[in-house]
Amino acid sequence: MPMDGLTLGFAAREINARIAGGRIDKITQPEKDAIVLLVRAESTNYKLLLCASPNNARLHFTNQNFSNPLEPPMFCMLLRKQLMSGRVLAVKQIGGDRVIHIDIDTVDEMGDHVLRRLILEIMGRHSNLILTDGEGRILDAARHVSLDMSRVRQVQPGLPYLPPPGQDKLDPVDVNEQNLLEYLTRAGDVPLHKAIAASVSGMSMPSSKEISLAPVRMSVFWISA
């Protein structure tokens, strides 16, 4: 099962329940597009993997012991400077899509509490890990996106963070029988699972196929749970 918006939403809620309020004790970057946060919460250590690999982007706890480079990458060094000993405020999915925000309360060089946000975007070859400050300004990212690479959205230190372009789809949280039926009708004469995928944000074909087998009321429950 791919990590679509539905799966990611369940994962985010589970992760938030375990590590919200926890302290970040260690940060490593075993691969170019993967970060591991060691979070201490409720007397338990959790290793949280955030991976922006184009082929296998994902978010989950792990017990794996990764091999890390002798010299930490620049992005990892910045994350350590900005996030070490910070407190996790929340892990949340944005708009039912495959975007995760991890909000962290930390202390800057002046001793003031500041907000930092670590963003995981799971978007195939456009997947990314991005760190922003409390005003939404990009501090750095695993992958920089220049104007030459994209005229729609750039990802560079110093620029304001812009979310991925939106789609005219239902947020799973807002799904009910009435609006789901309206969107399915709007999708036209296509198989039901394709209509669901085209109507609800973050839905993959495998998830849509499973949901299409259920009555509408049960489908609404699964989507908006």
State the predicted function of each range.
Residues 43-225:
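Phosphate/anion-contacting hairpin/loop surfaces
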